[in-house]
Amino acid sequence: MKKMNRVLIKRPASTFVLAQPRVLALALAAAFSGIAFAQNPTTNVDKSVPTFFNGQAQIVTGFQDKTKWIKQELWVETEFDSDGDGKKDRVHVDVTRPFQTDTEGLKVAVVYESSPYFAGTMKNQKMWDVKHKLGEASPARPVNEQAKFIPVRPEISRTEIDTWLPRGFAVVHSEAPGTGLSQGCPTVGGAPEELAPKAVIDWLNGRAKGYTTLDGNVEVQATWATGKVGMTGTSYNGTIPLAAATTGVAGLEAIIPIAPNTSYYHYYRSNGLVRHPGGYLGEDIDQLYDFIYSGAPEKRDYCNATIRDGLYPAKFDRKHGDYNDFWAERDLLTKIKGVKAATLLAHGQQDWNVVPEHTIRIYDALKKQGVATQLYLHQGGHGGGTPPLEMRNRWFSHYLYGIDNGVERDARAMIVRENAERGTPPTPYLDYPNPEAANVNVYLGAGGNKAGSLSTKAAAKATTEKLIDDVQYKGGVLANAEQSPHRLLYATPELSEALHLSGTPTIKIRVAANKPAANLSVWLVTLPFDDKVVGSNGQVGVVTRGWADPQNYRSLTKPGNYDSKLPGTPLVPGKFVDLTFDLQPMDRVIPAGKRLALMIMSSDQDFTLWPKAGTELSVDLKQTNLVLPVVGGADALKKGLGN
């Protein structure tokens, strides 16, 4: 094989990009893009500057000495006053940047992470009591001790620094309002959490003021910054990049939200139902407020009275679970039109803390409005699946430094397949859902207290089947039971071939209760059910799940994101109502030899409130069906069923 010669592409001002012949075209295009490219660390050039090879920022020797990194602490002035003192809140910021930004006039792009967690969180969290009658107020709110205040913290965090500093970026951290040394009140969503990171990005672009102290007047500027900013983070830290992006702030070029909570309604409610995040039974937005509140003690009385004990109980409606203006303000989908930043989203399919719809609803919306976006799905739980560094590097190299690496032409969806060994690259797909997927109706056949049928054949006659709610039985136990009065189960025959599902299943159900209120929980499972715990409150046998409040039947008339402000109404005992709602989105391959089953329950021990046992649900099988997104459509399903 002929040895390939390396080529140096020379630009003005003695800046270089290292290339190989096969990437020469990319390098040439980049050389005329107006971006300052870099030498390779092996070349005999005195100055260290960002270097790119095969479309990715490379580690540069001159940026590696941690003892020479410049560290700064400052406070950036925001445009809001959330703590009622009549002064604009300031947020605490730290900066780590290459020393060459001082000694050689180097300007660099920024990787930025913001969080309410950096200063620590509350210990021994106490939750709401979930054992009470549906539709009644919860027992008294538990009293929690908020996080300890730490008055001196010049270094906020070290996340992202070791990854990006040696590659020619600066790294910036900030503490969310009301946490650490940032002023203000925690609001858990809403405008302050959008405008605080916006202020930091404005400061990096010379549009906002930064100060050397919390309350002083000595200003500091970011003269070393190019103005190009990328944000990233996981969980709450992944929510904030998207929140900042909804403001449309200039300079925020790219974000990588990992397992972001994109709507506090969809975190604490589902389709009109009080539904807790997996692993945090009894948590609501007020507990999360206490959990993160690490800010100044002298402001806590005001913030607690105004927000936690004032706004929240007046608006969050833990009694009914309905969507309203309070929740809409904390739903980033309502503000998605402002997003311009290129968005690489990541989520785990076994994340039952922040469930997958949080990411998929945003991905779908951004595609529709033409924002550059890419999706990474893995098989793990909450926060456990950061996209490979190559993906993140290509994303930031392209959007922050203008490298023409073709990332915008990559496969739109990268999915880690089931049982993939650690380190196995994700499988690329043209998009998500898989473009070859089509919705297929499957129907329920009698026998659900044991195992009725699930097939493509609609019921010939009207049949009603009943279950009796009893929350003491976990869903996995009910799925494994040969017979149970506490659930209805409908299963396919054993699959003769693997079945690939890609998208969001939807259930259309006609149901009646013997009481004015009832929980409704739906699981899609594989049989025999594997109850091995996986991810965040997941089990291997769970394909996906969904929950809804039958009282909200007037607004549950079609699939898709739930954002109706129409309140629920008490059920008339014995009267059937029709509901249509989504289960959680997923991309799963069901192996041959398994049976796919729909399980209908009332209360879900790990997620819903726990009313006393005895509520009866009746399901009209003829007027109920499941819609499955099957890759290959009806033909693939029939083939998998051996038809």
What does each model-identified segment do?
Residues 105-116:
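Short beta-strand element of the alpha/beta-hydrolase
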Residues 339, 345-347, 351:
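Short beta-strand/loop motif that positions the catalytic acidic residue
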Residues 352-358:
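Conserved alpha/beta-hydrolase "acid-adjacent" motif
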